[in-house]
């Protein structure tokens, strides 16, 4: 019985020490760089339509929705209410530039497209890009499926923006670019 307890103690003691040491290691989240202060403190945002590439333009024109990324982001931002929406860049603290692209992805002889929404946040004073969020939008053959996938992309983009804009200056909860 003494041998069993000694063996058990001999096994558990190092396991406990290693787990304690591991618990003391900084986590990835605690090492995250801070979110730029302008994103956290900004009050007014101008939403810019940064357009789309040629492939995407053709698709949006066929659907008679050439400004859909801009319109959907504008509506989502208005609904969220975190930032006041400015009518001119000069009146804003930040510019949110929305762009839609469909990168060509080639694998051997098969070519496909990878549609994505891209939101770049600019500081109006310095004109520097502070942050970029990119969210994929799954392709579709049917319009109803495309509408659903596009809405999911906008929702995912807004969810990530909310995490970034709602964090403390430590940035511990934000995904870094």
Give the residues covered by each predicted segment.
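Bacterial N-terminal signal peptides
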Residues: 9-19
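Surface-exposed short loop/turn segments
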Residues: 25-26, 79-84, 89-144, 148
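A structural "domain/chain start" motif
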Residues: 21-79, 100-103, 132-135, 142, ...
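A generic short-segment signal for beta-strand/edge and adjacent turn/coil regions
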Residues: 10, 62-68, 85-89
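Solvent-exposed, acidic/flexible segments
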Residues: 59-70, 110-115, 143-154
């Amino acid at each position: 019985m003494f041998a069993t307890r000694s063996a058990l103690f001999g096994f558990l003691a190092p396991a406990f020490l290693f787990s304690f040491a591991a618990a003391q290691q900084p986590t990835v989240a605690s090492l995250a760089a801070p979110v730029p202060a302008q994103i956290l403190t900004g009050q007014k945002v101008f939403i810019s339509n940064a357009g789309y590439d040629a492939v995407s333009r053709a698709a949006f024109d066929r659907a008679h929705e050439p400004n859909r990324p801009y319109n959907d982001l504008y509506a989502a931002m208005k609904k969220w209410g975190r930032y006041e929406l400015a009518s001119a860049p000069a009146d804003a603290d930040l510019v949110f530039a929305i762009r839609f692209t469909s990168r060509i992805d080639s694998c051997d002889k098969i070519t496909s497209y990878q549609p994505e929404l891209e939101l770049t946040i600019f500081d109006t004073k310095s004109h520097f890009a502070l942050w970029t969020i990119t969210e994929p939008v799954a392709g579709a053959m049917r319009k109803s499926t495309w509408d659903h996938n596009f809405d999911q992309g906008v929702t995912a983009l807004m969810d990530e923006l909310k995490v970034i804009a709602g964090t403390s200056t430590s940035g511990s909860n934000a995904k870094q670019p």
